[in-house]
Amino acid sequence: MQAEIIAVGTEILMGQITNTNGAYMAKQLTALGIDSYHQQVVGDNGPRLEEAIKLAESRSNLVILIGGLGPTPDDLTKQTLAAHLNRKLVEDPDAMAKLQARVKQQQRPMTPNNQLQAMYPEGADILVNRVGLAVGAWIVNGQHTYVLLPGPPKEFVPMVDHELLPRLAKWSGHAEVMVSRVLRFFGIGESQLVTDLDDLIANQTDPTIATYIKDHEVTVRVTASGATEKDADAKLEPMVGAIMDRDGQYFYGYGDDNSLAKELVKTLAANDMQITAAESLTAGAFQAALGDVPGVSTYFKGGFVTYSLATKAAFLAIDARELAAHGVVSAFTAKAMAEHARRKAAADISVSFTGVAGPDTLEGQPAGTVWIGLARRGQLPEAHVYHFPGGRNDVRQRAVMTGMMLALRALQA
């Protein structure tokens, strides 16, 4: 048995994004004992994609196509494969109902290209998309088996874990149940985490360990197999415990579809507390991230965006002379912003951000210098200084995530 992975997307071919999906899929194939000697990357071009499929067929009996299932004109994967196999595309009623509900919620018309997301090659088995809208597929055609998977990692990984791996286990004769646990870390780089886990990774057999980095955080996926799910879970526990013993201080939560914002809101709910924020260089990004979490309105009533010294003084009632004396980029300003915002919003906890996003310096402070304030009811406010690398957007994003981690740890203390 041999498998071949074809990643579809011009942005991958041009180096605009990294093909992390291919690496993840390859590791899963290895864990199942399925040989994979070739990978291809093809742009969004039907004829060239069909050439890649034919080449894969000549040397592999499992062809896994990743990407190109979306609604845009350059998403051609399922159409190309269906035409190659001389099959028509048919509609999955459940996927269409989900799509219609989403379109109705967004109050926009249903378009033919959108409908394509709910379609699959006739005769295929559906691979359910738990996160997005584009269905995947498992297609047996003669001596070959084909798999269609979505490109966005947040859709791809859950589909692989929950829909594809059980099928691959049976297809390969690997009868055991596979269970994965996803650990999420922030505040540590992938290289440092891998160094910390070096011996665990070097000696891994079952469970296996895979690390990934995205948006300044690191994800560790631990996968084990067993005769039953309970047996596989029992194998996971010692490995997860060993990882937590080494880098638990950077851990914030479990799950593929998780985030610092979601964990923060969940912890606010568990403590029945309210949060607010006062933002300067992040310009509301912290509050926007909170606002993306369903149900947050119970725990976040509002906050402040105070970009200039004048608005800090006016909106937060901080003495302008004190601000001018200490400077905008200072511990004083971070503490004052956090505490005054907390009082004005009558919140239990408050986070503030002030600093230099770049590229220019400010008050003699280099780009990347960020003060984050933290104020809690009944406690003195505190301030922490950071020197974040990267461009303007990187600095702002790192600041937001660091502020969330600070608030999360304060609530968990």
Swiss-Prot record:
UniProt xrefs under Pfam families: CinA, CinA_KH, MoCF_biosynth
Gene3D superfamilies in alphabetical order: 3.30.70.2860, CinA-like, MoaB/Mog-like domain
Domain of life: Bacteria
InterPro entries, alphabetized: CinA (IPR050101), CinA-like_C (IPR036653), CinA_C (IPR008136), CinA_KH (IPR041424), Competence-induced_CinA (IPR008135), MoaB/Mog-like_dom_sf (IPR036425), MoaB/Mog_dom (IPR001453)
Transmembrane domains' residue ranges: none
Annotated NCBIfam families: cinA_nterm, molyb_syn, PncC_domain, PRK00549.1
HAMAP family in UniProt: CinA_B
Similarity comment: family membership: Belongs to the CinA family.
The protein, known as: Putative competence-damage inducible protein
Organism of derivation: Lacticaseibacillus paracasei (strain ATCC 334 / BCRC 17002 / CCUG 31169 / CIP 107868 / KCTC 3260 / NRRL B-441) (Lactobacillus paracasei)
Gene symbol of the encoding locus: cinA
